[in-house]
Amino acid sequence: MFNYVTMSKKVYIGCGAGFAGDRYDASIPIVEDFKSINEPKYLMFEVLAERTLAIAQQYRINDDTKGYSPYLDYYIKPVLEDCLEHKIKIISNMGAANPLGAAKRLSLIHISEPTRHCT
């Protein structure tokens, strides 16, 4: 049986965005703080609401390569290298109506951006 009273491990969660088009640099100081922490770390970008999803679906209907957050690059590029190096997991709903498209775009960002460390 697991004893929750003696559990000492902490989990750190930071929020880099709270709505579509939120500040693109908000995650940078969070990641800087996370770099020195040796516990599980998660960086969240919450950018989706009902209206945002409806707009994303319209984009995807018109072009099946679209439908994910048009801001994905702006949020991810400034912190991707440090997140990879310091094992900070990124959680987001930037995939909107096209999560596979967002994953492909993220892969392209990762391949095209020079990084010091890849996991």
Please identify what each model-predicted range represents.
Residues 25-27, 53-58, 101-106:
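Short acidic, glycine/serine/threonine-rich loops at helix termini
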Residues 109-119:
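Single conserved hydrophobic/aromatic residue that forms the stacking wall/gate
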Residues 2-31:
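N-terminal amphipathic/basic leader segments beginning at the initiator methionine
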Residues 10-14, 40-44, 88-91:
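Structural motif
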Residues 5-12, 50-66, 83-86:
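Gly-rich Lys/Arg/Thr-decorated short loops/hinges at beta-loop-alpha junctions or inter-strand turns
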Residues 38-56:
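N-terminal glycine-rich anion-binding loops that anchor highly charged ligand groups
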Residues 19-21, 49-51, 94-103:
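Gly/Ser/Thr-rich loops at beta-strand to alpha-helix junctions
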Residues 64-76:
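Class I S-adenosyl-L-methionine
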